[in-house]
Curated annotation (Swiss-Prot):
This is ATP synthase subunit c. It is found in: Cell membrane. It is a multi-pass membrane protein. It comes from the Bacteria. The chain crosses the membrane at residues 5-25, 52-72. Its main location: membrane. The record marks E55 as: Reversibly protonated during proton transport. F(1)F(0) ATP synthase produces ATP from ADP in the presence of a proton or sodium gradient. F-type ATPases consist of two structural domains, F(1) containing the extramembraneous catalytic core and F(0) containing the membrane proton channel, linked together by a central stalk and a peripheral stalk. During catalysis, ATP synthesis in the catalytic domain of F(1) is coupled via a rotary mechanism of the central stalk subunits to proton translocation. Key component of the F(0) channel; it plays a direct role in translocation across the membrane. A homomeric c-ring of between 10-14 subunits forms the central stalk rotor element with the F(1) delta and epsilon subunits. InterPro entries: ATP_synth_csu_bac/chlpt (IPR005953), ATP_synth_F0_csu (IPR000454), ATP_synth_F0_csu_DDCD_BS (IPR020537), ATP_synth_F0_csu_sf (IPR038662), ATPase_proteolipid_c-like_dom (IPR002379), F/V-ATP_Csub_sf (IPR035921). It comes from Clostridium perfringens (strain SM101 / Type A). Belongs to the ATPase C chain family. GO terms for molecular function: lipid binding; proton-transporting ATP synthase activity, rotational mechanism.
Length: 72
């Protein structure tokens, strides 16, 4: 088995972490909005910022895996 395929597979695992993180954040945002509906605008803006940061991790993993597959 080629080592770059193994390395690319491990780099893609960052997407799993991002998915779990966004799922937990979504659950927290929904629960917070249900408890305090008047703060939904602030909760939504914080959630979008957090989801974007979490998704950046998945994008970095994807870019690294593509580089490992096609460049190295």
């Amino acid at each position: 088995m080629d080592m770059k395929l193994l390395a690319a597979g491990i780099a893609v695992l960052a997407g799993i972490g991002a998915g779990i993180g966004i799922g937990i954040a979504t659950a927290g945002a929904i629960e917070a909005t249900a408890r305090q509906p008047e703060a939904s605008d602030k909760i939504q803006s914080l959630f979008i910022m957090g989801a974007g940061l979490s998704e950046a991790t998945a994008i970095y993993g994807l870019v690294i895996s593509i580089i490992l597959l096609f460049v190295v």
